[in-house]
Structure formats: structure tokens, C-alpha cells
């Protein structure tokens, strides 16, 4: 066994060892001075493909393709926010299993990874927010917290250890199936779009639509920890960014979210647009969503910043 592999195993067992901390200091630049794993190549290749398709999109423009972009962005984006984030990561509401799985599958098509991977990373983010162990810590720079952290799986292991915080998802066959077959679903989507509308639908759907949604999601990790307003006393740098709320389906009320992590509602004021909450509320009204969590008045008073 090589010395390198021995060190990596020590990182995985104890991400707080001096060797692991020193490794974190050395590995800010994710494209060199490091060992690339197969998962890193897969994620980088997927990202490169999505952005390349987006750059090709102007050459294949049609009005119908523009509608495909809107549908892809909306279905995938709401899948991420309603399913991966509020339902699976924070358990802020419950729905029947058939609906839970359907929403998760919509999120999978946003090309942001499988539920187990996404939810685990997000739970670690809340556990270690803005610290050295935050998977996408803003302390390591805007571009790292925005996108570059995705391409270094070993660095994530050195920070947080193995994905031991998603046993609730690992116990379910559906999420294990998606984790093992995610690439086939994305490829299938590509062939389906090509069958319906050729390269026009592929470039505008999986290119423009997916790229926009990826960067809006990433702005929550980067921009919403750097710029914006604060309403609540949280032990982090989370911010509310009002102009991003429509595009993020309500996710950019990020200081609200970090103050009340388990809340299904993130736009806590009537004027704070939160499309994801409107979807959850609709499910609740028609009897599909139960145990919907929102902060109490006492909790809001306790967390409010006195001005």
C-alpha cells in the first residue's frame, strides 16, 4: 500500500487529523496538485458538457426550444428546491412515497447529482456552516464556494468523512437505485430530447436550462454567504438576496433559511417571493403534504435582530 493511500485512509477515518488539516491548506486549487478520482472526472465531464451545449445553443435556436428551456429549468429547479432541499435534506414536510419519489426524480433531471450525494453535502453544510469543514466554505473564495468544490471528492472526504449522514435515504431502494444509475437517466433524457426536437431541444434544454439552474443553485452557496441583508441572528454569514428569489424559487432568502433550517417556508414575509413554498402549501391544502414545519412567533422573536 502506498503512503498516499494510507494518508487518504487516515483522512477518511478522522477528517480532523493534522495531516488532513494540512492537506486542506494545500488543496485550494482544485485543478492541479491533487489526485483526480473517477467521480471527479465524471462530475467535471458532465459540467463541461452542459456548458458546451449552452454555448452551442444560439446556433440551434427555435421558439419551441425556448419553451423547452423554461420547462427544463422549472421542473428541475423545483425538483431541487422542493424535493432535494426542503423535503429530503431538512424533512420540513411529508408527502406520500409516490410523490416523494416523483419529485426526487424531477430533481435528478436537473443534472446536479443523485439525492444521496446532494442531500449529504447539504446536511454537512448546515452542520459545519462557514467553518473549515463546510463542503463549500465561503472562506475559501467565491469560485470555490460557487462551483469548484464539486470537482474534488477527496477534499470533501477530508473535511467531513464518509457520507454517514444520509442513512434514512440509503435504506430506501429507490435512492440507492438512482445513485447507481444517475448517468443512464441523464443520457436517456438527452436521447429523448433529441428524438423530440433534435439538437435544438438538447442544447436549449440540457445546455441552457441546466446551466442556468446549476449556477442559480451555486449562487445560494456563494453569493448568499457574501452579499445581501440579514434579518436573523445566525452564527454564520448567510444573507437574503431579494432579486434572486424568483429565479431560485425562494431559495435566496438564505438568512431566513439558516435561522429556521427545518422550515418549509423560506420567504417568511408576505412580500418575500417563495415559489417552492407555494408548491408545498398547495400540496398541504389538497391533503398531500403533512407535518409542514414553519417557525413559530416565539422562535421568530428569539432569532430576530433588534434594530
From Swiss-Prot:
Residues in coiled coil: none
Phenotypic consequence of gene deletion: No visible phenotype under normal growth conditions, but mutant plant display a dwarf and sterile phenotype when grown at 6 degrees Celsius and also show increased sensitivity to freezing temperature.
Cofactor section: Fe cation
Chain spans, region Disordered: 1-21
Transmembrane domains' residue ranges: 53-73, 99-119, 182-202, 204-224
Pathway note: Lipid metabolism; polyunsaturated fatty acid biosynthesis
Stated induction or repression of this protein's expression: Up-regulated by cold.
Written domain comment of the UniProt record: The histidine box domains may contain the active site and/or be involved in metal ion binding.
Listed name of the protein: Delta-9 acyl-lipid desaturase 2
Name of the coding gene: ADS2
Amino acid at each position: 500500500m502506498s503512503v498516499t493511500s494510507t494518508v487518504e485512509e487516515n483522512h477518511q477515518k478522522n477528517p480532523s487529523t493534522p495531516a488532513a488539516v494540512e492537506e486542506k491548506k494545500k488543496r485550494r486549487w482544485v485543478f492541479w496538485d491533487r489526485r483526480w478520482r473517477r467521480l471527479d472526472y465524471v462530475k467535471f465531464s458532465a459540467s463541461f458538457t452542459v456548458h458546451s451545449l449552452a454555448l452551442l445553443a444560439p446556433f440551434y435556436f427555435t421558439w419551441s426550444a425556448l419553451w423547452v428551456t423554461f420547462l427544463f429549468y422549472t421542473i428541475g429547479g423545483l425538483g431541487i428546491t422542493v424535493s432535494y432541499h426542503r423535503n429530503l435534506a431538512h424533512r420540513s414536510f411529508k408527502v406520500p412515497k409516490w410523490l416523494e419519489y416523483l419529485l426526487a426524480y424531477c430533481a435528478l433531471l436537473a443534472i446536479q447529482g443523485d439525492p444521496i450525494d446532494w442531500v449529504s453535502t447539504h446536511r454537512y453544510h448546515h452542520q459545519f456552516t462557514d467553518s473549515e469543514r463546510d463542503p463549500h466554505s465561503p472562506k475559501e473564495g467565491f469560485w470555490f464556494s460557487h462551483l469548484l468544490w464539486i470537482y474534488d471528492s477527496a477534499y470533501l472526504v477530508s473535511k467531513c468523512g464518509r457520507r454517514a449522514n444520509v442513512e434514512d435515504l440509503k435504506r430506501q431502494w429507490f435512492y440507492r437505485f438512482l445513485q447507481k444509475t444517475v448517468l443512464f437517466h441523464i443520457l436517456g433524457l438527452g436521447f429523448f430530447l433529441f428524438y423530440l426536437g433534435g439538437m435544438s431541444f438538447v442544447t436549449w434544454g440540457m445546455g441552457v436550462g441546466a446551466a442556468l439552474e446549476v449556477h442559480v443553485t451555486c449562487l445560494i452557496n456563494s453569493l448568499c454567504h457574501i452579499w445581501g441583508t440579514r434579518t436573523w441572528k445566525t452564527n454564520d454569514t448567510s444573507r437574503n438576496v431579494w432579486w434572486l428569489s424568483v429565479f431560485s424559487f425562494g431559495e435566496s432568502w438564505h438568512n431566513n433559511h439558516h435561522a429556521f433550517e427545518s422550515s418549509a417556508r423560506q420567504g417568511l414575509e408576505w412580500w418575500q417571493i417563495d415559489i417552492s413554498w407555494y408548491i408545498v402549501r398547495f400540496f398541504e391544502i389538497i391533503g398531500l403534504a403533512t407535518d409542514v414545519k414553519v417557525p413559530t412567533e416565539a422562535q421568530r422573536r428569539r432569532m430576530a435582530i433588534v434594530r
